[in-house]
Amino acid sequence: LIIGAVIGAIGTVVAALIRNRRVPLTYHVRHDPVGISASDSVHGNVEVTIGGRPVQTLYMSNVWLVNRGWRDVENLDVTVLCAENGRLASASACIEGEPIALTHTDEHQGEWDSYKEAWEHRECAKASGDQAGLQHWDDAVQAAIKNLSTRRCYAVSVLNRGQTTRFTHMMEFAHGADPGIFLSCQKAGVRVQYKDPY
């Protein structure tokens, strides 16, 4: 009996050590349709816009990232990626139950700052009639938009055991395309997996 208890205790400790080597983070996604632009003879023209720009199909996409491990995770960089047939239009992120929104990683914020700077240079070149400068800065703006419209990178300072981070994005997709959004996190000791909530 004593030998069985000792073996059981050792097995429990070994299992806990193996389990705690990696922190399992799971995520699930819900896409709620907001609107579809259409034109037909019965209802006429319906146009969905975001920021004054027309879109074909607009979704509100929520992604929940849950720490299902036995320990807290610090300094986590989480990247939200949009499927190639879509575009991230606007975004917000927070740890549920916390009043403060998450910020972008320093690198991602630098990309936003570079985009804003390129936009300002483009507008100056446009106002001054500098066609070569306008073409250069317009190319830089378009490249930044393409990059920033497919992903967002967030800095999560601490994700405690059992806590959930929620990422909310307005996303646009072409007619008939299935919405797709994914999470990535490159950190030693952390494993991110998609898991259906039900």
Question: Residues of each region from the PLM?
Answer:
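Solvent-exposed beta-hairpin/edge-strand motifs
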Residues: 78-103
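Low-complexity, acidic Ser/Thr/Pro/Gly-rich terminal tails and inter-domain linkers that flank the onset
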Residues: 19-54, 83-91
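Hydrophobic, helix-forming membrane-interacting segments
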Residues: 1-28
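Hydrophobic residues positioned within well-ordered beta-strands of beta-sheet architectures
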Residues: 59-61, 76-78, 167-169, 181
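Extended, hydrophilic extramembrane loops/domains of integral membrane proteins
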Residues: 157-197
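Mixed-charge, low-complexity intrinsically disordered segments
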Residues: 41-49, 102-149
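Intrinsically disordered, low-complexity Pro/Gly/Ser/Thr-rich segments with frequent PxxP/GP/PP motifs
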Residues: 98-116, 148-174
